[in-house]
Amino acid sequence: MKTETDKIISIPLFGDISCGKFKFMDCDIEGYIEIPKSMIGNGEYFALRASGDSMIDAGINDGDIVIVEKHPSPDNGKIAVIRVEDSVLLKRFYRLEKERKYLLHAENPVYDDIILDECDVIGIAVKVLKDL
């Protein structure tokens, strides 16, 4: 008898997300990935493929699959998927309350922080799947 922890779920894979410079994200579903339900919580999830090297010090490399929970308001310091105009980025997110701005921080010292007046948070990264 299968238990809830044995259950496999499919989540949509939306293609590449920039881990570097701004990049447009193709909104078409590229496919689905199957993961054990026990790997994630109760929420709405999707997956993106990391593109670039700005998050390498957080363990996210070019080509990794990032599992994202839809969440419009992450805590400071969370790795988030952020839409800025027609681009989507994966960065560490900080809300600068005093300045009423947002800071997007890369986890690679060769990239500068990005400071924005406004942005749209799509979700927070919760898992990274890698090929070995």
Outline where the language-model segments fall.
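Short beta-strand-centered aromatic/proline hotspots
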Residues: 79-81, 90-95
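Hydrophobic beta-strand signal
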Residues: 47, 67-68, 81
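SH3/SH3-like beta-barrel fold
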Residues: 82, 104-106
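Short, positionally conserved secondary-structure boundary motifs
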Residues: 1-56, 87-88, 95, 99-101, ...
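Structural motif
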Residues: 63-64, 78
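A short glycine-leucine-enriched loop at secondary-structure breakpoints
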Residues: 57-61
